[in-house]
Amino acid sequence: MPEPTKKEENEVPAPAPPPEEPSKEKEAGTTPAKDWTLVETPPGEEQAKQNANSQLSILFIEKPQGGTVKVGEDITFIAKVKAEDLLRKPTIKWFKGKWMDLASKAGKHLQLKETFERHSRVYTFEMQIIKAKDNFAGNYRCEVTYKDKFDSCSFDLEVHESTGTTPNIDIRSAFKRSGEGQEDAGELDFSGLLKRREVKQQEEEPQVDVWELLKNAKPSEYEKIAFQYGITDLRGMLKRLKRMRREEKKSAAFAKILDPAYQVDKGGRVRFVVELADPKLEVKWYKNGQEIRPSTKYIFEHKGCQRILFINNCQMTDDSEYYVTAGDEKCSTELFVREPPIMVTKQLEDTTAYCGERVELECEVSEDDANVKWFKNGEEIIPGPKSRYRIRVEGKKHILIIEGATKADAAEYSVMTTGGQSSAKLSVDLKPLKILTPLTDQTVNLGKEICLKCEISENIPGKWTKNGLPVQESDRLKVVHKGRIHKLVIANALTEDEGDYVFAPDAYNVTLPAKVHVIDPPKIILDGLDADNTVTVIAGNKLRLEIPISGEPPPKAMWSRGDKAIMEGSGRIRTESYPDSSTLVIDIAERDDSGVYHINLKNEAGEAHASIKVKVVDFPDPPVAPTVTEVGDDWCIMNWEPPAYDGGSPILGYFIERKKKQSSRWMRLNFDLCKETTFEPKKMIEGVAYEVRIFAVNAIGISKPSMPSRPFVPLAVTSPPTLLTVDSVTDTTVTMRWRPPDHIGAAGLDGYVLEYCFEGSTSAKQSDENGEAAYDLPAEDWIVANKDLIDKTKFTITGLPTDAKIFVRVKAVNAAGASEPKYYSQPILVKEIIEPPKIRIPRHLKQTYIRRVGEAVNLVIPFQGKPRPELTWKKDGAEIDKNQINIRNSETDTIIFIRKAERSHSGKYDLQVKVDKFVETASIDIQIIDRPGPPQIVKIEDVWGENVALTWTPPKDDGNAAITGYTIQKADKKSMEWFTVIEHYHRTSATITELVIGNEYYFRVFSENMCGLSEDATMTKESAVIARDGKIYKNPVYEDFDFSEAPMFTQPLVNTYAIAGYNATLNCSVRGNPKPKITWMKNKVAIVDDPRYRMFSNQGVCTLEIRKPSPYDGGTYCCKAVNDLGTVEIECKLEVKVIAQ
């Protein structure tokens, strides 16, 4: 069973009940109001968290205690925290109620202080309340946290009146909730959910002493008295009453009894606590007379004299009476379980209905059979027997039913629960109106009566209008309404009575139109034409010229053009007659249809005549195909002639289009009309064939396109070649070299033409010394050096006379022609220049070149010199045998090649390069090596104990390389299996130890050079027998040598410069015995477990590698060596440089 917890913060005790049993009133059939205490236990996870926190109460050494203060006085609460195990100051918070943080309330009436005593290492936190007020009373909480540690403490503050007696208190004003102050203020006031009503004036009642009523009343009557006299703060009233009735008789069995009542939310947890006078008494708990047994729902705890009952997951069935017995005595209490607020889960929806229909407004709430209230425009709906409103409940559904809806029912309806509300609008419309007899159009003679009559389905009034204006009754005009029939009677019809009449029933958006026509002489209405009665039509379109006419009887219309009458029929040009118009129709207008047309109207009332001018306009003809007169790299110039026919309207301008020849998509080049007959298209792709065409534009539109122009290709020559230089000169030739042009273009590059001319043959004059401008030479004086175009950028001009001076230029040629020439900056003398020879020995040949027997030797030695030098090779001063060694020479290098090297090829090779009288020599040492021969003689010098002393002589043949060591092997005479004893041994004598006594051994020795071991080994002729019997060998006694040595650096650190981003290393060497411990430091701080550094120590050499250093890694680095005999340090500086990008 868990440890009992402290009484909940929000548990408020109620006065003890009087001796009367409240169950008697229950039996009488009444529902008494109960004394209760509000218990709001945090459910689930929050409670578990608080229980866990209470178990970690390890921070407070002194907790604040509850207290009592009078109004206007001061009080201080103190909390202390031990700081021995804390590295920093803990965090403390003061709360009032559950969540009100008092840190933001500090000021005139509240001060928070904190101090720290260094000797005792105790933090003291104080909360001082200055000039306390009534609303300061309540439950307070202090919380302290440090990292993962937490501690909390709750305490109560009671504020008493400083003076006065209880009967003088206005209890009804003191305990009305204001919604401010304590944490439970306004908690029981549900007036915010009720509709605001007008305050009714009540008759003044005589003054009543409510305290006396409460003191003498039963606890079951407290709530009744509180609501009767307007007391809403029931909890505060019970607290005050409890303090007034403290002189209660104490029980012999209970030192502290149950509170009169408890309240808890549904699903919450409640705790009942009693304190026994004698802890040995047996306690039993009962619910409604039934004994409670321990379970997961009911948990019993014992804490000293306290007996505690926990009820988990409280439900509505737990709302009942509980009592506890101890011996012959018992104490009881009431538990009230408060249901959660009812929420609206499905909102009301706006509804539209017709008058007389049944309307249903439906919503859903979170609980079945919940109590909800309906409102209409804020007024509560109370259904009754005579009311048209009914309310139906189906589980969670609540439906408001309105029978026979009227326009008065259109309003905003809302539903309200304890936890939410919803509203919707109801619109009630009239029934659709049916037209039984509509109005009809009428034609009347002048002076006759006009009667407009209609019949509708409803007996409602209406309004008459003529041409949108209300009809005014007069002696001649009467409006008649009889039941569903409406009439408009006009006597003695006049011409102005003609028009559109409309009847509109009231309250409906319905109109009944009718036209009245009064007979009149024929008229031709030409208001829709121009001032000169001209009609313009586009050729190819259909002309339908409708001329409004009037007259009664309808006049006969006759159309004519000149002397030719136009008849009705199916021809291209025809007329059509209608009661109110006559129409001239031309199906496909042509240019020849232009002219003056006449219309004649005739009826019994008279005649009318009119003339109309018809003008037929057309698109212009397409222009003639344009001509491209000039072409550039990305542009051209084009011209064209205007079209022969402008379509009867002046040409406004032209549109130009172009396309690639291989494409079918035309692209417009101008969006503003081109007024001229010439245009320059730009931004074309060089080397691509194009076509262009023209559109003519007049006021009617755009003509058809002209025929495309002949295809043309924008091309441009390349830029001149660049960097023309002299590559070489001989007595009869000049070799020139150049670079390709910077800009080649779409026409590409077909090749180059190299030209030259002799100095003095013309008036050659150089414009500048850089050769960028042309020489002042006639074109016929230049000689083409290459008959055909050349692709390479190097060419040799041959057949030149010696000592002549020539000018040279080069041109780039493509499909557009030859580019501007590139000139050499000065005349060239045709005479070969002697260049002294020079041998470029490769670096690896400046030392002895070593190869093994059988490997190939291939050495390339470059040289310089002009004209081509003469080369001579010698080996050790003698001519080289070309049958064994191949020599190949070129203009720039010589190659010595030996396919399969032999030891006889070793020696000194001399190379001589000669140009005219200039000579250059160089030497190369070649060493061909092979495996050595075996040692000459191997002897056994001495045998003693388990040891054998061997000596041998070096081999006669060292393989043309120095002997680097020997390998010694031994073999037992029985098995003759050879085992290596010593490898890479440098001396010619050795002692073989740890041989097996009683065995007989043979020994052999291999020679070794840089090629490897000798193929054969020399074996001892005689064997060495390790005798079993012999003298006992006694090891001589030597004094132990002291190898201890303090650390000493044999190679110091040096100052180093490193490049940022490249690994850097610091090296030093140290000696000492015992082996010293190495520690690296940067700026006097030891480097430990840093991934940017790696430390190595091998055979006394200490290395610190800094991976990809940055300027931050610069500084002073120190290597420290420590052993038992001493400590030594050495420093250096590292600077990291950043290479600018």
Curated annotation (Swiss-Prot):
Protein name according to UniProt: Myosin-binding protein C, slow-type
GO BP annotations listed: cell adhesion; sarcomere organization
Record-listed Phosphothreonine modification sites: 406, 798
Subunit structure: Interacts with USP25 (isoform USP25m only); the interaction prevents proteasomal degradation of MYBPC1.
GO molecular function, one term: myosin binding
CDD domains tied to this protein: FN3 (cd00063), Ig (cd00096), Ig_C5_MyBP-C (cd05894)
Effect of residue 223 to K: In CMYO16; changes in electrostatic interactions resulting in increased myosin binding; no effect on actin binding
Phosphotyrosine sites (modified residues): 823
Family: Belongs to the immunoglobulin superfamily. MyBP family.
Residue ranges of domain Ig-like C2-type in the record: 72-144, 251-340, 341-431, 432-520, 522-619, 837-931, 1047-1141
InterPro entries associated with the record: FN3_dom, FN3_sf, Ig-like_dom, Ig-like_dom_sf, Ig-like_fold, Ig_I-set, Ig_sub, Ig_sub2
Keywords, in A-Z order: Actin-binding, Cell adhesion, Disease variant, Immunoglobulin domain, Muscle protein, Phosphoprotein, Repeat, Thick filament
Residue ranges, annotated region (Disordered): 1-51
Task performed by this protein: Thick filament-associated protein located in the crossbridge region of vertebrate striated muscle a bands. Slow skeletal protein that binds to both myosin and actin. In vitro, binds to native thin filaments and modifies the activity of actin-activated myosin ATPase. May modulate muscle contraction or may play a more structural role.
Cellular component, GO, one term: myofibril
Compositional bias segments (type: Basic and acidic residues): 1-10
Sites bearing Phosphoserine, chain numbering: 611
Matches recorded under Pfam families: fn3 (PF00041), I-set (PF07679), THB (PF18362)
Effect listed in the UniProt record for changing residue 234 to P: In CMYO16; no effects on myosin or actin binding; reduced helicity of certain domains
Domain (Fibronectin type-III): residue spans on this chain: 622-721, 722-833, 934-1029
Record disease entry: Arthrogryposis, distal, 1B: A form of distal arthrogryposis, a disease characterized by congenital joint contractures that mainly involve two or more distal parts of the limbs, in the absence of a primary neurological or muscle disease. Distal arthrogryposis type 1 is characterized largely by camptodactyly and clubfoot. Hypoplasia and/or absence of some interphalangeal creases is common. The shoulders and hips are less frequently affected.
